[in-house]
């Protein structure tokens, strides 16, 4: 377990250096959202249970998604974020290819649910979108937008990527890596090669 956390931490450091630009100030939590904290444990920790209602009215529960999928990606965004809007078409291509194994949920802690619904309708994005409490973004350390939190089939936060991913091949590589049955071993071996 310690090797797994160390390997994932080193991977995060390496990937953060490759991150695109994030945009936007982190919104401060409102008093009403303070009661909705997740007790998030960070990279390498188990993601706490969370439930959201999508713009389509569907209730998504993390534990249920992880029974069906090998990877869940929480993408924090807001409508006036130019880098979020650049990332979405690329994310859509990757989602279309990997949706059997990967679920993406675009979480918006800034805009009203009606605005998110209108945005999704005009953008034709097929992955679920939902409003979320601002406290979730704060607790998960979202310092800029977009930020994506990758959660593996065991509920472990395996990557936090700050900034836009604007190359579909990057999504393909991440999805291939984190949906592989032996991804922890592959990452550990890759990192071991780097530090030799």
State each model region's role.
Residues 78-83, 109-114, 135-136, 164-166:
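Solvent-exposed loop/turn segments at secondary-structure junctions
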Residues 70-72, 77-80, 144:
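Short pre-active-site segment immediately N-terminal to redox-active cysteine/selenocysteine motifs
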Residues 118-126, 131-191:
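Thiol/disulfide oxidoreductase modules built on the thioredoxin-like
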Residues 50-72:
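A short beta-strand-turn-helix
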Residues 73-74, 104, 148:
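Hydrophobic beta-strand anchors of alpha/beta hydrolase catalytic cores
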Residues 76-96:
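Conserved redox-active cysteine motifs that mediate thiol-disulfide chemistry
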Residues 86, 94-133, 145:
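Conserved segment of the thioredoxin-like fold in thiol-based oxidoreductases
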Residues 1-51, 170-173, 192-196:
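N-terminal targeting signals for export/organelle localization
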